[in-house]
A protein has these predicted regions:
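N-terminal interaction/assembly modules
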Residues: 1-88, 135-150
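Short amphipathic alpha helix immediately N-terminal
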Residues: 89-106
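Short, conserved sequence motifs enriched in acidic/basic residues, glycine, and aromatics
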Residues: 88-89, 116
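Short alpha-helical "recognition helix" segments of helix-turn-helix
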Residues: 110-115
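DNA major-groove recognition helices of helix-turn-helix
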Residues: 122-136
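N-terminal positioning helix adjacent to the helix-turn-helix/winged-helix DNA-binding module
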Residues: 78-81, 92-94, 125
Length: 150
């Protein structure tokens, strides 16, 4: 599995665990199709032949980002990360995966040309992910506060 096919694995393994641990915890090899990653790759290739519209590609990208976001959040909760880690490291993690990887590796111009949308829409996707992290962090803090009164 290459970084181009699934960048999240590369980032996660660098930040936390070995490749085997990531495979075990997230199970990405078994879930590629359910995440839409395999479909995304295939349709991205077919889009060069003109079979897909830019709207379809934009939707694929958005759905893929949301699925990655969801799986990483699940990973953090399953491993019972502390509230500080979920609040701080997760923000950096999403920034790396959902923003910097696409921007720095695929470059702004290529992204805008491929998906036919501008920088403001890419920033919007990034902000949506970061907002989700903030909501997750607040939920964890509320749970900790509630349990301390029991």
């Amino acid at each position: 599995m290459t970084e181009k096919q699934f960048p999240v694995h590369c980032w996660l393994s660098r930040m936390w665990d070995t490749e085997a641990q990531i495979e075990q915890k997230i199970g990405y090899r078994d879930k590629l199709n359910s995440w839409g990653v395999g479909q995304y790759d295939a349709e991205h290739v077919s889009s060069r032949t003109g079979e897909n519209t830019s709207e379809t590609k934009y939707l694929e990208y958005t759905v893929l980002s949301e699925e990655i976001e969801k799986k990483i959040t699940e990973y953090l909760y399953q491993n019972r990360r502390t509230e500080a880690v979920i609040g701080n490291v997760t923000n950096n993690l999403y920034r790396n995966i959902l923003f910097d990887w696409y921007i720095n590796h695929k470059k702004w111009n290529e992204l805008c040309r491929t998906y036919n949308y501008g920088k403001s829409q890419l920033y919007s996707i990034r902000q949506k992910a970061l907002d989700a992290v903030a909501r997750s962090s607040r939920k964890v803090k509320q749970r900790k506060t509630t349990s301390s009164f029991r």
